[in-house]
Amino acid sequence: MAMQKLFTYIYEFIKYRKMVLLEEKVPYDKFVQMVLNTGFFRINAETLNHGIVSVFIFGANGKYVHHGGDMRTLLTNTLNEKKHYEELILIVDKPVLSKKNILDIIVEQRAANPTIVINIYPYHLFCINIPKVSAIPRHKLITQEEAQEFLGREYLQPQDLMQISASDPPVVWLGGRPGDFVQIERPSETAMHAVVIRFITKSKI
């Protein structure tokens, strides 16, 4: 069931992020076959800035999520492809996020590739269309100029704002990064919406 949802919503995620697929969407049965046979399924997309984003969906029992050496080789070979990579998104079963050997590889690859965003997330962030969940208030990234205008008007510094993690589901779907600002519209009893600004901070993983 998780794989069926992942297959559906990962493409909605790519569309929501305004990315363009670089290959045709494959049928679901081929997606499952590739996850089972190779241990992962890869989607390549291009951002509005013409950067490349590669999304890897890893099988829960594949070698890449159990053996750090295999994960290191895969990521190293990927980043050596000489493409203009902007981001790698690794999607794994939640227990993998507690595996020190895998997380150490992520830290290592980030240090070796400081200009490329490398993130690892659990399946459940992509098993639902987060922006369409009615219980979640609307989130929107704002520009640095808009944020500075707000801070100046309120006599605030970024550190004075309440924070939101880069791994918060709406932020993940928006593509927000540490140092960015997000505007959140919450229901209000005195107005249609109460607007708050949050400062995005580095996630724990």
From Swiss-Prot:
One Pfam family this sequence matches: RNA_pol_Rpb5_C
Protein's name in the database: DNA-directed RNA polymerase RPB5 homolog
Subunit structure: Part of the viral DNA-directed RNA polymerase that consists of 8 polII-like subunits (RPB1, RPB2, RPB3, RPB5, RPB6, RPB7, RPB9, RPB10), a capping enzyme and a termination factor.
A Gene Ontology BP annotation from the UniProt entry: transcription by RNA polymerase II
Keyword Transcription: yes
Record keywords: DNA-directed RNA polymerase, Host cytoplasm, Transcription, Viral transcription, Virion
GO CC entries: DNA-directed RNA polymerase complex; host cell cytoplasm; virion component
Species of provenance: African swine fever virus (isolate Tick/South Africa/Pretoriuskop Pr4/1996) (ASFV)
Upper classification of the organism: Viruses, Varidnaviria, Bamfordvirae, Nucleocytoviricota, Pokkesviricetes
A GO molecular-function descriptor: DNA-directed RNA polymerase activity
UniProt record similarity statement: Belongs to the archaeal RpoH/eukaryotic RPB5 RNA polymerase subunit family.
InterPro entries with a match to the protein in the record: Arch_Rpo5/euc_Rpb5, RNA_pol_subH/Rpb5_C, RPB5-like_sf
Superkingdom of source: Viruses
Annotated compartments: Host cytoplasm; Virion
Function description: Component of the DNA-directed RNA polymerase (RNAP) that catalyzes the transcription in the cytoplasm of viral DNA into RNA using the four ribonucleoside triphosphates as substrates.
Statement: the UniProt record of this protein carries the keyword Transcription: yes
